[in-house]
Every structure is written in C-alpha cells, then in structure tokens.
Amino acid sequence: MKKVKLAEIAEIFSGLSYRRYLDDKGIDFHVIVQRSIKKDGELSDFDNLKLSDFKDRYFTRKGDVLMKMPYPYDVVCVKEEGLVVSDRIAIIRVEKGYDPDFIAHMLTNAHIKKQLHELGSSQKLPHTSLKEIKELELVLPDYDTQVKYGELLNTINEKIAEDLKVVEYDRNLKEGILNQLWEAQ
C-alpha cells in the first residue's frame, strides 16, 4: 500500500461553464449537470443543450472520474464517451496504472469526506475546490488489487441500485392499493 495525493496520479480540472457556449445553431449535446451524478455511482438525467466552439477536454472519456464540487461530493466513474461535463464538477483523468473504478470508490469513502471537511470552507453549503481535490490523500494497493476491489464494489453498487428499484416498486404498490380503497368508496 502506498499513500499518494490525487494530483500525483491524475489530471484534475473543472467542467465546462457551458452558458457561454449556448448557441441555437449549435450541435445537440448531452450535458452532465449536478443532478446527473447520483449517489452510489449512477449517472443519468442529462440536460440536452445546443452548444458550439468549446474544447474537446470537456467531453467524457471512458474511465473519467467525475466528482460534484458542492456537498455531498457524489462521485461516478464514466463508462460513456462524448458527454459534456458542466462546471462545478471536477473531471479526474486517472493515469495509466491506476484503476478509475477503484479511485472513484475511494473518493466516496468517509476518510475522503473527512479530508474535504478539514480542507474545505466553513460555508453553510459546503463546497470544495480543485486545489483541495488535488490535495486529497489516498492509500492505494497495487494495480491488480485495485481492479479486483473496483469490480467488487461496482457489483455491490449494482445490487444497491436493484434493491432500491424493488423498494420503489413496493412503495408504488402500497400507494396503489390505498388509492384503490379510496376509489372504492
């Protein structure tokens, strides 16, 4: 196991401040905004916007790790290329030799939340900066171990997502039964 700062193993920069690039004659893009990054590594619910003339660095690449900069600092490892990342989201491009899935899971850990709290501002709505994200210290095993843990933790996240769908289905079923009772009156 070795201790490293995130900036030592990744390029880290902010997403696109897309409002400057809005253009009715531009190209349609799926834009990752704050609500797109969900707890437990889920990525969905994009904005569809017409944009023009911005740098390729703001397009997702497979293996990018995205982190919300406002609290609760949700994190996701990107599987789909070509999405546009908006501002207030840190794009973390992990170097070869490190597993992005594992790094994404590490960034959701309580030790990282504690570091962000200690490094961060004392505002009512906590927010972190790129400088603070670059200073985060991670304890990393060798690459093969990272891959194994990354796969295991991905499987656990998938199970959590499925379990939450079952809970939502059961809530809807309960509500439907109660509504039928009201309608039977």
Language model: regions and residue ranges:
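A short beta-sheet element
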Residues: 67-108
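Short hydrophobic interaction/assembly module
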Residues: 51-74, 133
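Non-catalytic DNA-recognition/assembly elements of restriction-modification systems
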Residues: 1-21, 25-27, 135, 140-185
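Sequence-specific dsDNA recognition surfaces
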Residues: 4-20, 34-62
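Short, surface-exposed loop/turn microsegments at beta-strand edges and helix-strand junctions
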Residues: 22-29, 58-60, 77-88
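Glycine- and charge-enriched low-complexity intrinsically disordered segments
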Residues: 101-123
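Hydrophobic residues at beta-strand termini and immediately following loops
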Residues: 32, 92, 136
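A short glycine-rich beta-alpha junction/loop motif
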Residues: 84-87, 122-147
